[in-house]
């Protein structure tokens, strides 16, 4: 074959092909078919460009080389055949002068008439298969693809063949001649069968010196050098090999690897049952705040003082009554607990000096609500050794719940903007080194996008409640301490605001281990009528406690004010994580940064400013039954933040399991989208693992529903 190449092709082409193979560390004497393929490709590129010029009027003309007018501008810039550094220099220069988008891979030609890069393909296989491989590798609509075959077929982007019929016929004739010459020498079959699919790695990294010796030393047994190992890996067909290995390991294991196709995956099955209910530690979209602006009262900053001041802003209190009972609870006790709280707050106000903290009287209703004396008595294991039928008590299987629309509404609300600013600019850590000015610029842009987001309010509320509850749990272990649920923010005009959402009363809290539970009763204000979505409020007893005057378009309207009361519990470890909810800001900032980095590496400059300031550009936010939802960069920031915050608010073993297992399916689907031909075994087992996490948790059910939307659109 090498001899044929030297006879058949122009010496300049042969020399360029030798250089190219040397640059990629390939041996022309061993890889003779590749040598022939490179020469053929080079010749087609040169023939494509030959005789094509642009005249002074900017029109494309064909001129034979001995014509005196041959000083005209060449229509095509040849990039193929140059060494890599030079080729990229040419590409960059073209991009700078013409404004063309820089390609990710080195193209073969640039067409000055059509102002586009061209990728030339010469294939021994079907043209459309090779075309799709090229298109999939390049992933750019800006680069024009033109494929020729040795059988006279061709294919080009949008059937735009660039050249006139005669020029293309010359190329096809030459390819047909090469094929016939090879066939007459008995070389064609080997050459035809040796074509491999389009490689997506555009350059082979050459390892030399110490690193090369280390690589040779660290090979698996039976491999003498890195090249042999590379050849083995390149030609490795994993599926049959893995099946064989598995069957050797155990007679029970029988893993038949099945191809994963567009029709393979089915939707995740969501459970049937009554609708799921709200399980967050505090109200989210339904919360109501009693607020004071520019607080300057005595003791400002002391929670109890702030709470009393906020309570005084409301004048519509009325005799409370139960509007939505808690099915399993003693509802009069919840009502009595609220009345007790009001009475004890009144007592404080009547005192000369308001105390810094308030411990509630241990009344029967609070003892019941806080589970006092309800825990089974702990017995030392040594005292039970002799009991023959000792066993752990049976616990009921959790009841399956179905997805309900309220959790999607909660998420949508969390992504929205409020009319207050919840974090200062310095909330997300400080710069450590001067090199981080880009980091601080990104952080400031990001903070500006999320500082008014409702998810950010949830962060600050969560941090406050968990900090206060953990402090009280340690400082007043035996007391039923009253903890106001407070947050602080600024108005858009910069005025400070203190907000009261309601109160928590904590139970006994002798927390030795991280997982020991402290019970608490939460009482939270709201304007949401629980009768609209009773299933959401299954765990709550809801009282009507007053009437609030609200400004509306038609003047002042009176709306009933509700109090959502429930018994809840948390642990040291949960409170510790709750106190660190600000991490959600950091996590979503890092996700945004990776988007900016990807954009910057394509454009080869920092794109932070353009990323945040180009308001016209939209970005993918997520999947919905309608398709891929898009929005502004601010919306993307807020959506990512809301996801992170909900992962914290609704943290659970179900979420951990679903995230870990569904990720495996996601990776397989993404591999399919990238045409990597993935194979799977025991896909049914993976679905089982995913679906056993779908029990009753609203956030997990919503994520599963989103995942199904993604599957639908990803596999179209």
Swiss-Prot record:
A motif (Nuclear localization signal 1 (NLS1)) lies at residues 124-139. It is an enzyme of class 3 (hydrolase). One of its GO terms (cellular component) is host cell cytoplasm. Its EC number is 3.1.-.-. Mn(2+) 1 binds at residues 41, 108, 119-120. Mn(2+) 2 binds at residues 80, 108. It is found in: Host cytoplasm; Host nucleus. Binds 2 manganese ions per subunit. One of its GO terms (biological process) is viral RNA genome replication. Phosphorylated on serines and threonines by host kinases, including human casein kinase II. A motif (Nuclear localization signal 2 (NLS2)) lies at residues 184-247. Its cofactor is Mn(2+). Gene3D superfamilies: Influenza RNA-dependent RNA polymerase subunit PA, endonuclease domain. Coiled coil: none annotated. One of its GO terms (molecular function) is endonuclease activity. InterPro entries: INFV_PA (IPR037534), PA/PA-X (IPR001009), PA/PA-X_sf (IPR038372). Keywords: Cap snatching, Endonuclease, Eukaryotic host gene expression shutoff by virus, Eukaryotic host transcription shutoff by virus, Host cytoplasm, Host gene expression shutoff by virus, Host nucleus, Host-virus interaction, Hydrolase, Inhibition of host RNA polymerase II by virus, Manganese, Metal-binding, Nuclease, Phosphoprotein. Influenza RNA polymerase is composed of three subunits: PB1, PB2 and PA. Interacts (via C-terminus) with PB1 (via N-terminus). Plays an essential role in viral RNA transcription and replication by forming the heterotrimeric polymerase complex together with PB1 and PB2 subunits. The complex transcribes viral mRNAs by using a unique mechanism called cap-snatching. It consists in the hijacking and cleavage of host capped pre-mRNAs. These short capped RNAs are then used as primers for viral mRNAs. The PB2 subunit is responsible for the binding of the 5' cap of cellular pre-mRNAs which are subsequently cleaved after 10-13 nucleotides by the PA subunit that carries the endonuclease activity. Belongs to the influenza viruses PA family. This is Polymerase acidic protein. It comes from Influenza A virus (strain A/Leningrad/134/17/1957 H2N2).
């Amino acid at each position: 074959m090498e001899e044929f190449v030297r006879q058949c092709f122009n010496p300049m082409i042969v020399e360029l092909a030798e250089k190219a193979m040397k640059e990629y560390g390939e041996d022309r004497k061993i890889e003779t078919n590749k040598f022939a393929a490179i020469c053929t490709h080079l010749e087609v590129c040169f023939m494509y460009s030959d005789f094509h010029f642009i005249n002074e009027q900017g029109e494309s003309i064909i001129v034979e080389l001995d014509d005196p007018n041959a000083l005209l501008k060449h229509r095509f810039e040849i990039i193929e055949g140059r060494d890599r550094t030079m080729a990229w220099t040419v590409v960059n220069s073209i991009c700078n002068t013409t404004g063309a988008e820089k390609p990710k891979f080195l193209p073969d030609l640039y067409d000055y008439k059509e102002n586009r890069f061209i990728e030339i393909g010469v294939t021994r296989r079907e043209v459309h298969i090779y075309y799709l491989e090229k298109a999939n590798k390049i992933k750019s609509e800006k680069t024009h693809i033109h494929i020729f075959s040795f059988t006279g077929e061709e294919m080009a982007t949008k059937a735009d063949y660039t050249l006139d019929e005669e020029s293309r016929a010359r190329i096809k004739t030459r390819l047909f001649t090469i094929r016939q010459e090879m066939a007459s020498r008995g070389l064609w079959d080997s050459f035809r069968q040796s074509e491999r699919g389009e490689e997506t790695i555009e350059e082979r990294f050459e390892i030399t010196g110490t690193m090369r010796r280390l690589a040779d030393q660290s090979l698996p047994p039976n491999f003498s050098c890195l090249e042999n190992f590379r050849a083995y890996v390149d030609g490795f067909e994993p599926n049959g090999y893995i099946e064989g290995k598995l069957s050797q390991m155990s007679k029970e294991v029988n893993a038949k690897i099945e191809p994963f196709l567009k029709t393979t995956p089915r939707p995740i099955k969501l459970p049937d049952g009554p609708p799921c209910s709200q399980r967050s530690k505090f109200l989210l979209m339904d919360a109501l705040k009693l607020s004071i602006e520019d607080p300057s009262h005595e003791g400002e900053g002391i929670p109890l003082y702030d709470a009393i001041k906020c309570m005084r802003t409301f004048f519509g209190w009325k005799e409370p009554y139960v509007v939505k009972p808690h099915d399993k609870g003693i509802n009069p006790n919840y009502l009595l607990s609220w009345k007790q709280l009001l009475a004890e707050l009144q007592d404080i106000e009547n005192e000369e000096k308001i105390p810094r903290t308030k411990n509630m009287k241990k009344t029967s209703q609070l003892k019941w609500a806080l589970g006092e004396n309800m825990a089974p008595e702990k017995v030392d294991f040594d005292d039970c050794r002799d009991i023959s039928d000792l066993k752990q008590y049976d616990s009921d299987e959790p009841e399956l719940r179905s997805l309900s629309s309220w959790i999607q509404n909660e998420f949508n609300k969390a992504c929205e903007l409020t009319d207050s600013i919840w974090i200062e600019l310095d909330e997300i850590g400080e710069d450590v080194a001067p090199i981080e000015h880009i980091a601080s610029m990104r952080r400031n842009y990001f903070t500006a996008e999320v500082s008014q987001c409702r998810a950010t309010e949830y962060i600050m509320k969560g941090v406050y409640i968990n900090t206060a509850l953990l402090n009280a749990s340690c400082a007043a272990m035996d007391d039923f301490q009253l903890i106001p649920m407070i947050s602080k923010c600024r108005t858009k005009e910069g005025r400070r605001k203190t907000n009261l959402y309601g109160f928590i009363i904590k139970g006994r809290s002798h927390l030795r281990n991280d997982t020991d539970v402290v019970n608490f009763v939460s009482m939270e204000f709201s304007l949401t009528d629980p009768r609209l979505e009773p299933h959401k409020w299954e765990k709550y007893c809801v009282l009507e406690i007053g009437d609030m005057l609200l400004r509306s378009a038609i003047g002042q309207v009176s709306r009933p004010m509700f109090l959502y009361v429930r018994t809840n519990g948390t642990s040291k470890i949960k409170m510790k994580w709750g106190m660190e909810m600000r991490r959600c800001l950091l996590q979503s900032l890092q996700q945004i940064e990776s988007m900016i980095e990807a954009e910057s590496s394509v454009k080869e400059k920092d794109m932070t400013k353009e990323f945040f300031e180009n308001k016209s550009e939209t970005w993918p936010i997520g999947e919905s039954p309608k398709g891929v939802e898009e929005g502004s960069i601010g919306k993307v920031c807020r959506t990512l933040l809301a996801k992170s915050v909900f992962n914290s608010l609704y943290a659970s073993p179900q979420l951990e399991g679903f995230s870990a297992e569904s990720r495996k399916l996601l990776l397989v689907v993404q591999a399919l989208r990238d045409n990597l031909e993935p194979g799977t075994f025991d896909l049914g087992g993976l679905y089982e693992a995913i679906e056993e996490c779908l029990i009753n948790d609203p956030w997990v059910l919503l994520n599963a529903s989103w995942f199904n939307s993604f599957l639908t659109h990803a596999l179209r």
